Amino acid sequence: MNKHTTVLSGLTSHLSRSEFEKAVKDHQGDKGVRTLTTYDFFKMMEYGQLSGCFSVREIENSMKANSTKLYHAGLPQLKRSTFCDAMEKRDSHIFEDVFHAVVSKAQRIAGKAIKQFKNPLRIIDASIISLCLSKFDWAAYRKAKGAVKLHLNLDGDNLIPYDAYLSCGKVHDVHGMAELCREPGVIYVLDRGYVDYKSLYDIELRGSFFVTRMKSNGKYKRVKNNPHAKDGPIVSDVVIQMTGNNTRKQYPKELRKVRYYDKEFHHTYEFITNNFTLTAQEIADIYKARWQVELFFKWIKQNLKIKSFWGTSENAVFTQIWVALILSVLLWICRTLDGISASAHQILQMIKTTLLSKNSVFGLCTNTAPPPEIYSSQLLFEELL
């Protein structure tokens, strides 16, 4: 069977099968499995995500309606009970590992792409995904509400996930920050909710930079003024030392505080950073880039299935979110390698009803005809190479 004959299999081909099987082996995903392998389960999850199915029954019915095309996509028939069992029992850490493998490939492809700044830009934020507490009783968030939280480290240069961490909704953002801000030599952009001076100092000690907004109750003393244009948006640029009883101990070094006036929104912002070499305008521009992570959260919630779930256990919910994140990176890889100018949203709209068609994502986006059929006898040479 030609693994590149359908849109779905072509997209999946950007995922290393050997790295996938390594993740399965590491977590014993196929131990005792008789019918549905973890890889086939993953492809069914892909199908459900990309076709916009709200339930397992809908996935099953959709695949039945396309049963004659399943072979070319390398998909077996879906049995609802087997699929639901896999949702509950296949360790979600398998798909977390696969996500990291796909991210590594994306970073290799990005290579030495032009960066906005000298250091790589990483945007940190978290988004709440609401759940019905009566169905997801393990996900208690507030009195009558359940939720999980997606903590994300977004590659600010390529606008794709770089790292992620999933937790129950109660987990504070700062804990996610500790999980995601471990890389040296980068610039982390953080919302004001992440201002924990001990955690910020950990970033400093790792040899990285941060840009965030200062809390209104922060106590400090001015050490010196940095020169800046009086007629521009920079109101002030000063070096400060924290003076609070706890904050002075938690962050003993000096910080830089930039006050910036946004003419468009008629609002003044105060940023703090441990970077003393970038211009004040660059500091403001870096923080403005934080909006990209909000756009990503909006995109993934609107285009992939991470608000309605096909299982009720923590493992099932986390598995579904990891698969959505994997697909977001695979779409970026596909767009980049094939030079597709269409947005990820436009691509998803085109492939939603053509997943099992004999075509490629590139063919869909450029209106080119699919490649000619390759018969099994010709595939012998592919196996021998």
Labelled PLM ranges:
Residues M1-S62, R90, I94-A101, K115-D137, ...:
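Single, function-defining residue in the core of a domain
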Residues H72-R90:
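Major-groove recognition helix of helix-turn-helix-like DNA-binding domains
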Residues K64-A73:
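Extended, structured, electrostatic nucleic-acid-contact surfaces
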